[in-house]
């Protein structure tokens, strides 16, 4: 029983590593938005929707990792 519990904790910890990648991805998306806007301010209205889409996709991968972690901890 203790081995199964330890495996759950290790699996949940490994699953949360994906949250770090999501945070880095979001930072890269908004850094690119700031860089593009500073180079050409007239493209702000064109670049912003793409940045929000990139943010949403990066955040979704992080939420999937968090969901898997919770399933490992509290699931069957």
From Swiss-Prot:
Pfam families: ATP-synt_C. The chain crosses the membrane at residues 14-34, 52-72. CDD domains: ATP-synt_Fo_c_ATP5G3 (cd18182). Gene3D superfamilies: F1F0 ATP synthase subunit C (1.20.20.10). It is a multi-pass membrane protein. Coiled coil: none annotated. It is found in: Mitochondrion inner membrane. One of its GO terms (cellular component) is proton-transporting two-sector ATPase complex, proton-transporting domain. The modification N-formylmethionine is found at residue 1. It comes from the Eukaryota. One of its GO terms (molecular function) is proton transmembrane transporter activity. One of its GO terms (biological process) is proton motive force-driven ATP synthesis. InterPro entries: ATP_synth_F0_csu (IPR000454), ATP_synth_F0_csu_DDCD_BS (IPR020537), ATP_synth_F0_csu_sf (IPR038662), ATPase_proteolipid_c-like_dom (IPR002379), F/V-ATP_Csub_sf (IPR035921). Keywords: ATP synthesis, CF(0), Formylation, Hydrogen ion transport, Ion transport, Lipid-binding, Membrane, Mitochondrion, Mitochondrion inner membrane, Transmembrane, Transmembrane helix, Transport. SUPFAM superfamilies: F1F0 ATP synthase subunit C. The record marks 59 as: Reversibly protonated during proton transport. The keyword Electron transport does not apply. The keyword Mitochondrion applies. Mitochondrial membrane ATP synthase (F(1)F(0) ATP synthase or Complex V) produces ATP from ADP in the presence of a proton gradient across the membrane which is generated by electron transport complexes of the respiratory chain. F-type ATP synthases consist of two structural domains, F(1) - containing the extramembraneous catalytic core, and F(0) - containing the membrane proton channel, linked together by a central stalk and a peripheral stalk. F-type ATP synthases have 2 components, the catalytic core F(1) and the membrane-embedded component F(0), linked together by a central stalk and a peripheral stalk. The central stalk, also called rotor shaft, is often seen as part of F(1). The peripheral stalk is seen as part of F(0). F(0) contains the membrane channel next to the rotor. F-type ATP synthases form dimers but each monomer functions independently in ATP generation. Belongs to the ATPase C chain family. This is ATP synthase subunit 9, mitochondrial. It comes from Pichia angusta (Yeast). The lineage of its organism: Eukaryota, Fungi, Dikarya, Ascomycota, Saccharomycotina.
